[in-house]
């Protein structure tokens, strides 16, 4: 199912690229899948990564969406849970949100606004998923379903665009 998710999340950008942008750029460059070039100092890059991982750990602690699949496995479940988070969900989300949606919004509205808009859309997508899965929604869970993914989406967009010259590989 992980490979299928990556294919589906890549198909939408690919079809748009084929229809409208094929003559302008290579598909992988167009969505940000290229070797990153660091634009800032190691100190700034490290600070950004530490903040992102703090948000990621907080969301992992709060969220039961992924961890519930592995909760009966004990410590053995940590590795598959991380694989699901980083490979299946991470790659799919990066291609669609930072690589496709984010890059189009940045091209139209600039880096600051484009990064913020893709982050908010990323947060709303998590609320839509929670509603589709009939997960409980209350004010405290809104932090888990919207605010944390929005902050994470903003941080990842910032890391990609401001630190690594638009490459989505670091995120």
Give, region by region, the residue ranges found by the protein language model.
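Functionally important transmembrane alpha-helices
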Residues: 116-119, 138-171
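Small-polar-interrupted transmembrane alpha-helices in polytopic inner-membrane proteins
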Residues: 56, 85-86, 90, 112-127, ...
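Alpha-helical transmembrane segments
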Residues: 1, 5-13, 45-56, 117-121
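Juxtamembrane helix-loop-helix connectors linking adjacent transmembrane helices
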Residues: 25-92, 102, 107, 136-141
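Interfacial helix-capping/hinge residues at the ends of transmembrane alpha-helices
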Residues: 28, 98, 102, 153-157
């Amino acid at each position: 199912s992980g490979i299928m998710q990556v294919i589906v999340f890549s198909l939408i950008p690919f079809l748009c690229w084929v229809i409208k942008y094929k003559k302008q750029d290579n598909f992988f460059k167009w969505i940000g899948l290229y070797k990153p070039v660091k634009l800032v100092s190691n100190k700034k890059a490290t600070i950004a990564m530490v903040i992102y991982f703090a948000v990621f750990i907080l969301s992992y602690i709060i969220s039961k969406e992924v961890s519930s699949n592995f909760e009966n496995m004990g410590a053995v479940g940590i590795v598959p849970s991380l694989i699901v988070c980083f490979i299946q969900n991470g790659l799919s989300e990066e291609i669609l949100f930072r690589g496709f949606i984010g890059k189009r919004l940045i091209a139209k509205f600039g880096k600051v606004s484009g990064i913020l808009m893709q982050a908010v859309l990323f947060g709303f997508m998590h609320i839509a998923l929670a509603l589709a899965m009939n997960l409980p929604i209350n004010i405290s869970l809104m932090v888990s379903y919207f605010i944390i993914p929005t902050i994470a989406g903003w941080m990842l967009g910032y890391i990609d665009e401001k630190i690594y010259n638009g490459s989505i590989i670091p995120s």
